[in-house]
Amino acid sequence: MKVFIDSGDIAEIKEAQSMGVVDGVTTNPSLLAKAGKPTKRAIAEICEVVDGPVSAEVVAVEKDAILREGRELAKIHRNVVVKVPLIDEGLKAARIFASEGIKTNVTLCFSAAQALLAAKAGATYVSPFVGRVDDAAGDGMDLVLQVVTIFRNYGFSTQVLTASIRHPVHFVQAAMIGSHAATMPLKVIKQLTRHPLTDVGLAQFLADAKKIPELV
């Protein structure tokens, strides 16, 4: 499963990249606003750091406007993936982007039916939001399972990019289900490296190492 970092902060992205585990980046207007840089500049900088897909989101809800913004974003770098909302107009735009060779990440997916339509429209990725589904008293991982199963049943090339991952359990469950990729903030990536027994074992090894006689 590919690991993406969900961030617009170049320092966070570089830190995650230094671990050698990051395959791509997802951003959204909220994350880029926190970075305090113009969108095109921020995306260009991210593309210089990570040699993988970088999702950049349009801020439009009408097909022609989505197409205009998306085409401009796609010009920034060959790795840019245009994020479009999972609405009627977004699907119309995704279909045209696909015909133009522009990769898309159809985002804000909350049902398997939505995901199926996104795949039929030619989306490169579809992003089911597991954490937000859980917040609404649903089962986010069951949604991912449904989407993965449907895509396998019908041989869709669209990849499942599990989003809104809140903790390591979400990450492991997504991998077990067969999600193609998962995106998460740096905080969760760091949580994945930690385990209390690792800390205990390391502390013991370091303590025992001090007992080894030094060679003269």
Curated annotation (Swiss-Prot):
A cellular component annotation (GO) from this entry: cytoplasm
Statement: the UniProt record of this protein carries the keyword Lyase: no
UniProt main location, coarse: cytoplasm
UniProtKB keywords: Cytoplasm, Pentose shunt, Schiff base, Transferase
Example GO biological process: pentose-phosphate shunt
Cell location: Cytoplasm
Top-level taxonomic group: Bacteria
Active site: K83 (schiff-base intermediate with substrate)
Enzyme class: transferase
Transmembrane segments: none
Family: Belongs to the transaldolase family. Type 3B subfamily.
Protein name: Probable transaldolase
Organism the protein comes from: Sorangium cellulosum (strain So ce56) (Polyangium cellulosum (strain So ce56))
Gene responsible for this protein: tal
